[in-house]
Design a protein with these regions (language model features):
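Active-site ligand-binding patch in enzyme domains
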Residues: 1-117, 125-128, 184-185
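Active-site lining segments that contact anionic ligands and/or coordinate catalytic metals
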Residues: 54, 115-117, 136-138, 170-172
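Small/polar glycine-rich anion-binding or flexible loop at a beta-alpha turn
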Residues: 123-129, 146-147
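Shared catalytic-loop signature of beta/alpha-barrel
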Residues: 138-144, 150-152
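Conserved histidine-centered catalytic loops in small-molecule metabolism enzymes
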Residues: 152-185
Length: 185
């Protein structure tokens, strides 16, 4: 964890960042959990290539996010929450869900908004919930040769599937996993 005002650590290389933006441009929406928004305040847009930015989706089950989060200033922003969110800008689509709503309910709610493809970018808890529910087609993991803190630890383990490994510039390794089970489209 970093202190307030400290910039996020950069793990991606320029080449892998560009590839990530190309991947983002392929989806209708990009989803993150409230922990990721609170720690990183991501823009969830496409900047490094020419392409359409997906709709940003914040899954904020406990109502921890504020209107100041950068995600809520983006066009088409969506907030899935279990609490009243009258404090968010009127342009933000707020979907109220049960606090224990599973990933299928999230996908169904987004589908009713015309969103047919979702990239789940983080954090670890949200990613794990989609993987455990079988609601994934492909997973992409970038591993940087960096350890943070005294006891660096992996936040997300790889799901089962067909692995493809590629090296990226700067010593990073890209692992792609294809779901061998029933595909969810």
């Amino acid at each position: 964890d970093r202190g307030a005002g400290e910039p996020a650590a950069r793990f991606s290389t320029p080449l892998s960042s560009q590839a990530m933006h190309a991947l983002r441009a392929q989806f209708d929406a990009i989803a993150v959990g409230s922990g990721t928004v609170l720690s990183d305040d991501p823009g969830l847009d496409v900047r490094l290539i020419d392409g359409r930015s997906p709709r940003p989706v914040a899954i904020d089950r406990r109502g921890r996010l504020t209107a100041a989060a950068r995600i809520f200033s983006r066009p088409g922003a969506v907030c899935l929450t279990s609490v009243s969110r009258d404090d968010l800008p009127p342009e933000v689509s707020v979907i109220t869900m049960a606090p224990d709503a599973d990933p299928r309910a999230v996908i169904q709610a987004l589908g009713r908004m015309g969103i047919s493809s979702v990239m789940v970018e983080g954090g670890a808890e949200l990613l794990r919930s989609f993987i455990d529910s079988g609601l994934w087609d492909d997973a992409r993991v970038e591993i940087a040769p960096i350890t943070l803190g005294k006891h660096g630890k992996s936040r997300v383990s790889l799901p089962s599937g067909t692995l493809t490994v590629a090296s990226a510039d700067g010593g990073n390794v890209i692992i792609n996993v294809k779901n061998d089970g029933d595909s969810v489209n």
